[in-house]
Structure formats: C-alpha cells, structure tokens
C-alpha cells in the first residue's frame, strides 16, 4: 500500500496559524533538495527548477542535495549536473543509503570540499547502459556511438572531479564498482564521511 507524501506543520512568519505542507516543500524552505528515487526527466526538471529558484533567492547560501538513488537517465542527470555547475550557490551533496550510477555521478558533482556521505552509505559507479530492443542495425549503430560518446564524457568529468587517472576511471566503470563511504572518500568521489548534520 503506498504511503504517500508525508505532511508537516508549518507556521508562516508572523502568523499564529499552522498549516500542513508536504515534507519536500518544507525541506526546500531550508534549501534542502531530496533526490530519493530513479533519475527521470520529470524528476530532473523538478530538481533543476528548485536549484534555479533557490539560487535566484540567495546565491550566497548553500543548497543541500541529499541523494539516495539507484541512478537513471543520463540525459536527465546531465541536466541536473549542468545546472549545479551553472548556478552560483555552492551545492553540498550528501549521500545516505545508496548513490549508484547517475546518483554517484551527481554526488561527485557537488562543490569541491562539500561532497559528503553518511558512514553506511554505498556508492556505485559503472558505464552508461543502453538497450537495443527490436530495431534496425543502423539505429543500433547510432545508439552505440552515442553511448560511447556519453561514456567518454562521463569518465572524463569523473576523472577531473576525483583526481583519478582517466584510465583508472575507464577500468573501474567497466563493470559495477561498489564502494563504502570511506572507500569513496579515498577514491575522490566525496570529500568527507560525516556522522552528524553539517551546520
């Protein structure tokens, strides 16, 4: 049975009345965005909109992006990545649970020195996935070329952001490569393992 989106009480400043709002809207008021599912076009549009809004509201304050995601669409994830790099607000990324595939890529995309993970988090990197389905050989060839182009791009960005040699990234992403939070710190995907909420 679906749980639905939890609601929490909220009192407008200067008001004596409480109203109930969904938890994600309440977190956004604290400049917290939660990526807690597969990365899809719809989710990416929502996260991009939140990033742009929070940056326009006050670009000197950090935005916290909490990640617990199995990954998902590369193009949707790249929309989030590009927006994170585009805005002026520092983006603090925090992994809790799992950051896999595009989730790990976005974790690594946070502001340098501000990429964090909770102690029991798991991080997994791998190469982009593609499917052939029932299509003509020429279409499969076009898709294969695009997947190889994306793979090269993602590997280069990850090498730049982790400090790892490109050859190591290429080797490690050839198959699913799981890491603990501490291993991800040593690898350069994150900067710190934390047990308490950052101030």
Curated annotation (Swiss-Prot):
Its EC number is 3.4.21.92. Keywords: Cytoplasm, Hydrolase, Protease, Serine protease. Gene3D superfamilies: 2-enoyl-CoA Hydratase, Chain A, domain 1 (3.90.226.10). GO terms for molecular function: ATP-dependent peptidase activity; ATPase binding; serine-type endopeptidase activity. It comes from Synechococcus elongatus (strain ATCC 33912 / PCC 7942 / FACHB-805) (Anacystis nidulans R2). The active site is at residues 101, 126. One of its GO terms (biological process) is protein quality control for misfolded or incompletely synthesized proteins. Disulfide bonds: none annotated. It is found in: Cytoplasm. Cleaves peptides in various proteins in a process that requires ATP hydrolysis. Has a chymotrypsin-like activity. Plays a major role in the degradation of misfolded proteins. This is ATP-dependent Clp protease proteolytic subunit 3. InterPro entries: ClpP (IPR001907), ClpP/crotonase-like_dom_sf (IPR029045), ClpP/TepA (IPR023562), ClpP_His_AS (IPR033135), ClpP_Ser_AS (IPR018215).
